[in-house]
Amino acid sequence: MTVIIQQSKTYLTTKIRLSQEGCSVSIKHFFLDGNTSKGYVTLVKNIVKTINKVYTLKGSLGNEKNKIFKRISGNFEQQDLEIYWLHNPSDENMLDGIVIPDKGIAVIDGSARNGIEAKYSNFIERIFDLDEALDKTQLVINKNSIIQMQEEIEQLHEGAYAKFAKGKEIHEQKEELYISAMDFDKANKVTAKLAANLFHDVIVAKENPIVEQLFFGAATPNGAVNYIDSITSDIKKRYIIKGRSGSGKSTVMRKIAKYAENVGLAVQQFPCGLDPNSLDMIIIPSLSVAIIDGTAPHVIDPTRPGDEVIDMFELCMDQSIETKYDQRFEDLHVAYKQEMKEGTRLLQEAKQVRESLEQIYQEAVDSTIFTEKINEIIADITA
């Protein structure tokens, strides 16, 4: 079968639709930001680059913003449109925004952490400030408590990032040992074979391919959470790459992604939630193909007819390395798990403090003004 590629400028819409009229509403789940070993990392720039209309909701009322995101989502769901929910890595039950690809619309939390307003204010359609509905007198009464809680939340997050950074350092020690057993010629052959299978009958129809980025998973107060199954729900072919640390999984993805770009295909890249400089998944929507790192903490095993496992440890490594360094690997594994556990605990504490802070803001809401504000926001965005 020859594939002729036609790309869309609309965010994450260059994909094969498996159903047409009468399709059921689809909500896909992603993370826009991450609690990583590099600190708080946001991919909000990708939204600004690829979406025509970006709205932001700013303000201190996280729970209320979450409700508004879901109300706007519900409006577009009634139109049988696909919606992307962008979850908050510090509380995955809360949203940082939504995207409606077919409308070219995004509604994003305008918090200071993702920097969307500070960096991209000229490209924002409209900014809505929910703090306009707060009784400032009530907030002044609680000023010291608010400032103390804000500082505590920041310190707890910084502590978590330090733990994740230490975990990454330990992980890199494992990588170094495994890399010593790596046969790079074999790894290159695996990549070349995969590229040949994917691209041998592609006819390039457009230059300047679109490259998009989001996180499929994140370190959260509940541990590592991923939405791989949601994101790949309509993908026909999934290559699940297994292997040890340092077995070249991310390198394979980067090379395949580059092959795709070179022949004019759009690519969706999903950085690692711990190390955002590494890739954990790519999707080539026009081919309905995903290549996934199927190892912990996001273990993916073949469950669908189109799933295929590529085991880099079996194909490209001297497996005696594990016998040689058996105890060392075990010690590193235990140390890594401990750092990640501590980082998760700190995120849990930060979430608890944030919930207390949220309660203070909630008690300062002028319900009449707030209701008017919500109606204004929803009417403007869904018009």
Language-model features, listed with the residues they occupy:
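Conserved nucleotide-sensing/catalytic segment adjacent to the nucleotide-binding pocket
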Residues: 77-134, 261-337
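N-terminal amphipathic/basic-hydrophobic helices that include classical n-h-c signal peptides
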Residues: 1-23
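An accessory alpha-helical subdomain
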Residues: 145-197, 328-331, 335-377
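Phosphate-binding P-loop
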Residues: 46-51, 229-236
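Internal, well-ordered alpha/beta segment that forms a basic, Gly-enriched binding/recognition surface
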Residues: 121, 125-161
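N-terminal ordered "arm"
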Residues: 49-85, 108
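Glycine-rich phosphate-binding P-loop
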Residues: 55-72, 237-257
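N-terminal pre-Walker A segment at the start of P-loop NTPase domains
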Residues: 22-42, 201-229
